[in-house]
């Protein structure tokens, strides 16, 4: 379990950041997909504040072992909500892969929450192991989506790479796409999976690793 500590803490810190951003940009102009989802819903400000409260609660609770499971459950549910909000958009634009990519962006966070939830179960039950496997392979599927999305929008991905970084924008767009593909293979095969997940965390923090088409 000790190997999970850093990832769990970072997972919570990101959730806290989402909560703060939701509170600061409650006018829905924040550059975050989570906030924009509420754009056309009635009483959307109340929903944004509620989401912010869940992010903050879950992000703080997940920092301590005694409350980590409750925090993971709260975060898993809110991320699942955001993932499901993309389903009608996918149905409306089934030929635009970016919509699927946005779903898997959120579902990757659901998968992370599932892993934390299962890891901090009070006993080593079969149910906990099953939830952990679902989270693990769910995340692996999301990594496949990250790879496919960059393949479809390679030029857009390249545009996010600063021009001054050698050897060039397209080089790094192709390189990160290959990195995602190798990580997916590692996760599904179980070989170097821990290393792959750690490198993925760093890769996902880079602006070159995602492009969104509005």
Q: Which residues are covered by each model-predicted region?
A:
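Membrane-interface interhelical connector segments
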Residues: 25-40, 152-171
């Amino acid at each position: 379990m000790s190997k999970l500590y850093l990832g769990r803490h970072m997972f919570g810190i990101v959730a806290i950041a989402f909560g703060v951003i939701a509170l600061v940009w409650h006018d829905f102009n924040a550059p975050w997909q989570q906030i924009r989802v509420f754009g056309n819903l009635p009483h959307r400000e109340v929903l944004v504040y509620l989401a912010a409260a869940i992010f903050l609660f879950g992000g703080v609770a997940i920092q301590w072992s005694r409350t980590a499971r409750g925090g993971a459950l709260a975060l898993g549910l809110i991320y699942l909500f955001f993932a499901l909000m993309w389903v009608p958009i996918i149905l409306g634009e089934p030929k635009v892969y970016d919509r699927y990519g946005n779903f898997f962006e959120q579902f990757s966070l659901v998968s992370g929450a599932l892993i934390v939830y299962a890891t901090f179960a009070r006993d080593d039950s079969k149910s906990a192991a099953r939830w952990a496997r679902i989270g693990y392979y769910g995340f692996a599927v999301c990594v496949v989506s990250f790879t496919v999305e960059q393949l479809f929008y390679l030029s857009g991905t390249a545009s996010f790479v600063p021009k001054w970084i050698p050897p060039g924008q397209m080089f790094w767009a192709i390189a990160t796409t290959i990195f995602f593909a190798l990580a997916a293979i590692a996760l599904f095969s179980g070989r170097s999976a821990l290393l792959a997940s750690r490198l993925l965390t760093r890769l996902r923090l880079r602006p070159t690793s995602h492009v969104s088409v509005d």
